[in-house]
């Protein structure tokens, strides 16, 4: 198994799909990485040479991925909470942040229904 950005990349998958196993790399960014390194998207990771894997490591290293990205997202949310702005309050209360309706939906964010005691 190849190890890129501290993650074991699955060998049996195509390069584009295997790169999406890294947090912060989706399909579009994986395609861009393959284009920049000159590696075909339909080649499996097990078929790549060590030199090609090193190229992938270097290209992935240019992006904020995995732990650094998770930390950045957490700090951004914490900053909103500290500011006390509307988005921070919505995060604090566990409600949708981006203007979705909450009268009938938003069950994922709000959690299971709580019965009203009479």
UniProtKB/Swiss-Prot annotation:
Q: Name one GO molecular function term.
A: structural constituent of ribosome
Locate the coiled-coil region(s) and give their ranges.
none
Where are the membrane-spanning stretches?
A: none
The family database entries (Pfam families) matched by this protein are listed as:
Ribosomal_S13
Q: Which GO terms describe its biological process?
A: translation
Q: Does the keyword Ribosomal protein apply?
A: yes
Tell me the keywords, alphabetical order.
Ribonucleoprotein, Ribosomal protein, RNA-binding, rRNA-binding, tRNA-binding
Outline the segment boundaries, as ranges, of region: Disordered. 94-118
* Gene Ontology cellular component list: cytosol; small ribosomal subunit
Note the superkingdom of the native organism: Bacteria
Could you tell me which PROSITE patterns the record lists for this protein? RIBOSOMAL_S13_1, RIBOSOMAL_S13_2
Q: What does this protein do?
A: Located at the top of the head of the 30S subunit, it contacts several helices of the 16S rRNA. In the 70S ribosome it contacts the 23S rRNA (bridge B1a) and protein L5 of the 50S subunit (bridge B1b), connecting the 2 subunits; these bridges are implicated in subunit movement. Contacts the tRNAs in the A and P-sites.
Subunit relationships: Part of the 30S ribosomal subunit. Forms a loose heterodimer with protein S19. Forms two bridges to the 50S subunit in the 70S ribosome.
Family named by the database record: Belongs to the universal ribosomal protein uS13 family.
Q: Which protein, by its recorded name, is this?
A: Small ribosomal subunit protein uS13
Q: What is the protein's species of origin?
A: Pasteurella multocida (strain Pm70)
Top-level taxonomy? Bacteria, Pseudomonadati, Pseudomonadota, Gammaproteobacteria, Pasteurellales
